[in-house]
């Protein structure tokens, strides 16, 4: 029987602040975020592992034309050391022109490997279509690919994706609303009304009354100085304040592929009884030979004989009393020896019966 893994998360928040969270660990400043960049380019210098797809040939011809080299009309360059790629990067907040960022390069054609290639100058654009960085450099590819003359092939990891550390130069700064207005808004990473109110209370206890207010379950607005230098010092002090976030909602997370189950601290069970059993149907096909009597004129034939047996396991039942916790659920499930599929069926049935106080999430 396939085993399942059961993980128990029991987070106990004491009354003291020994395990309190910093504001910077549970929230982020609104408008201060990274931005995704993307670009299309060519990788050259491949040892015969490139491609000759139409769009690669077109891009190659356009690149030569930019350097003043005009190919004769109708010419289709047969290239195997060039590959068309997409280049992606993440532009951190407050990045300044001249700073460098990492880029990821991935093949979009039929190239077999990017190992040993060099990315040619590629413009990286943001959502607004503006160029924010320019990428170029030698790729580092962890994967490999080898192919024999008889068609045998060995591939390790992914040879068509590589990275260039500090491979892009920032050319344009992304404007942020950090220095504008009279307020700074913090957005919680996990929305919760109680956490938002506790965070606002912690800021008010530090700065004074009416300095912070919870706007909703996600946002907390804090009055801040207008001077940008004072605002940086102000934010540095605020983000290091500690407070006790609220406990998370009662949840049971089930991974249907791995059989992993995570049960939250506040999951409670209502009165219920569950029967767990199984029925096995086995069908066996036996072939026998039918031999006719001598001089009867009949033919020898093969006759299939089906043997069907049904085996039913002894049903198992466990009962939940009011107010039982996840410990009781774990103990009961382990006693019946349920497989992952059986356990998920039990949890779904309990949820549909209204016997679980909490969310059941299957991923």
UniProtKB/Swiss-Prot annotation:
Q: Does the keyword Lipid metabolism apply?
A: no
> What is the annotated role of this protein in its UniProt record?
Assembles around the rod to form the L-ring and probably protects the motor/basal body from shearing forces during rotation.
Give the GO cellular component terms, alphabetically. bacterial-type flagellum basal body, distal rod, P ring; outer membrane-bounded periplasmic space
Q: Which InterPro entries does the record match to this protein?
A: Flag_FlgI
**GO molecular function annotations of the record:** structural molecule activity
Q: Which Pfam families match?
A: FlgI (PF02119)
Which GO terms of type biological process are on file?
A: bacterial-type flagellum-dependent cell motility
Which family is this sequence assigned to?
A: Belongs to the FlgI family.
Per UniProt, the keywords (alphabetical) are: Bacterial flagellum, Periplasm, Signal
Annotated localization: Periplasm; Bacterial flagellum basal body
Query: How does the record describe its quaternary structure?
Result: The basal body constitutes a major portion of the flagellar organelle and consists of four rings (L,P,S, and M) mounted on a central rod.
- UniProt gene name: flgI
Q: Where is the signal peptide?
A: 1-20
- Superkingdom as given in the UniProt entry: Bacteria
The molecule here is called Flagellar P-ring protein
